[in-house]
Amino acid sequence: MTQDERREYLIQYLLKEEIPFGRQNIPTDRQGQENLLRSLMNVRPPRPISNDFLKIQDEYLTERNIERGITDVDTLAPVKSDSRLYIWQGDITTLKCDAIVNACNSQMLGCFSPMHACIDNFIHTYAGMELRLKMHEIMAKQGHEEETGKAKITSGYNLPTKYILHTVGPIIQWKVTKEDEDLLASCYTECLKLAADTGVESIAFCCLSTGVFRFPQQRAAEIAT
C-alpha cells in the first residue's frame, strides 16, 4: 500500500464505525485527509479495533513520523552549566530519546478534542490508537482517576521515543499554593523514579501545568530545576 492508500483505508474504517461520521465527505487533498484522520483518531473511544487496522495504522504513522522529521537527542548540545541537562524547543513527539513526558488530565486517556493543539493530543495522535487502549487498560485496573503528582509509563508505540511517561500536574484555581508547588515537584520526581526503574537514560520533559492548568511559567521552571 502507498501512504495515500493507507490514509484512505484508515479514514474509511473509522467513518464506517460511526453512522453519523459515515455520511461525511472525504476531502480530496492530502492536508484535508490528514486533518480528518487525526480528528477521527482523537474522538474515538478506547474500544477494541481490528489487528488489520492497527497494522496499517502503524505502517502509516511510522512513515508519517519520518516525514515530520526526527531529532536525535544525541545530536544536541548540553547547557554549559550541566552536561546532563539540555534545553530544546520543538515538537516533543519528534524527539528520539529513551522517554518523553506527557502532560495529561486525570482520565489519562488522551485529548478527545479534534485537532486540539495540546501535547496530549499530539502524543496520542502520532503514537497511535494502541496508546489510548493501553491507558484505558491501566486505568480500568487502577479503578480510579489518576492522582495529581503521580506518573505512569507506557511504550512509545509509533513515536521515535522508547517510552512515554504520563503525569497529571496541578490545576491553579486562584493563586499558587505550597501544595500546588509540591504536587508539581512530585510530577518530576515520580517521572524520574519510573524512568530510573525502567532503565531510561534520556528523558525529555515538556512544560508541566503551564498551559490550560495555569501554573505560572517562571515558578514552574524554578521547580523543575
Residue ranges of each PLM-predicted region?
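Macrodomain-like recognition of ADP-ribose-binding/processing modules
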Residues: M1-T225
